[in-house]
A protein has these predicted regions:
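ER/Golgi luminal nucleotide-sugar-dependent glycosyltransferases, focusing on the catalytic module
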Residues: 1-360
Length: 360
């Protein structure tokens, strides 16, 4: 039994708490799970209004493309009677590879493509110039591993559909992405003359995988059985968020409400939350599996990924051999784009733009 006893002081826990605050301030972000952006009601209403306009316009265009009138859109693109490719850049930083893309676009006719940029408004970026000038669409905040990336892609699709009825393919491009071929090579690949002559339906180039070791955890990231009845586990798919969709599939994406109600829900398990890699493959696999190739045209290297990010290429790795290697695939087609490149790769890439990248 102690000889002396001291009364408990209320100052001790108070002092302990005060001393702990600086520690929590500095270590908290590394201990607590990061907060994910959610879809706000105003943003949802803005998107629905945009989608409805694009859907109404698409459904009113039942005539063959050759009967479409020549029009000038609010983004300044002039419609002609040849199908176009809509290049949709999704970025939260400067477009570091704009000079390389400028060469890509300047080597072809301007009436064969349109450019759209979704730039996170919370981040200040340099105003794009050249063919990219005035191409930023009304944008919202985005965050990796959140439904905001799905919203941004849908926003780009709807804007491009509304802007020009001759946008026939819609390619989603990252700011870390580079072209691997010339524009004319890509255009010839997508609008194959044999398909045109036979009046065949075009296919969407989107990766759709049904097997993955992490698929179950990602399916239940919002809670067990939350995805049902809209999406059962055997319908859940995964794939690259960067795709090249046909117009009919772009329409299906912006028409969807059923699956979106589930994919926009916040995740409980944020470590397994990558909705942007599941929404599009799952939706199109359920809606039109035969209309999709199930592979992407964007090459990415996952051999030494870090925190869910693919391998990043740096200047010492950039060479003609790398470009040739990145083009190769396991199928009969060639990859058209590649990521992820660090901004300082621009100079070595520009040095071999004409002699390697755009020499088909």
């Amino acid at each position: 039994m102690p000889i002396f006893s001291y009364p408990s002081s209320p100052l001790i826990p108070t002092l302990t708490l005060l001393l702990s605050l600086p520690i929590l301030f500095f270590l908290g972000p590394n201990i607590l799970p990061p907060r994910r952006l959610t879809i706000t009601a105003p943003d949802e209403l803005d998107d629905l209004s945009l989608f409805q306009k694009a859907i109404a316009l698409s459904k009113s265009q039942s005539a063959p493309k050759s009967h479409l009138p020549s029009t000038k859109s609010r983004l300044g693109s002039t419609s002609t009677f040849r199908p176009k490719i809509a290049f949709m850049f999704l970025t939260n930083s400067d477009l570091h590879f704009q000079p390389l893309w400028e060469v890509f676009f300047n080597k072809t006719q301007p009436n064969l493509y349109n450019i759209y940029i979704h730039a996170d408004p919370s981040i200040r970026i340099k105003p794009p110039t050249g063919v990219f000038a005035d191409k930023i669409i009304p944008s919202k905040r985005t965050q990796r591993s959140s439904p905001t990336l799905i919203s941004a892609a849908r926003r780009l699709l709807a804007t491009a559909m509304l802007d020009d009825p001759l946008n026939a393919y819609f390619a989603l491009i990252s700011q870390h992405c580079i072209p691997l071929h010339s524009f004319n090579y890509l255009y010839g690949f997508l609008f194959d003359i044999h398909k045109l002559r036979k009046n065949l339906d075009y296919l969407s180039y989107i990766e759709i995988l049904s097997e993955s070791e992490f698929l179950w955890d990602r399916y239940n990231a919002r809670g067990e059985n939350v995805m049902t009845p809209e999406v059962h586990f055997d319908q859940f798919r995964v794939g690259s968020q960067f795709f090249t969709l046909t117009r009919r599939h772009a329409l299906k994406v912006i028409e969807d409400r059923r699956l979106w109600r589930k994919f926009k829900l916040p995740c409980i398990n944020v470590e397994s939350c990558y909705p942007e890699e599941h929404y599009f493959p799952t939706l199109l696999s359920m809606e039109d599996p035969n209309g999709c190739t199930k592979y992407t045209l964007t090459r990415v290297n996952w051999t030494d990924s870090v925190n869910g990010h693919p391998h990043t290429y740096y200047p010492p790795e950039v060479s003609p051999q790398l470009i040739h290697t990145l083009r190769e695939s396991n199928s009969s087609y060639s990859y058209m784009f590649a990521r992820k490149f660090s901004p300082d790769c621009l100079n070595p890439l520009m040095e071999m733009a004409d002699s390697v990248i755009f020499k088909d």
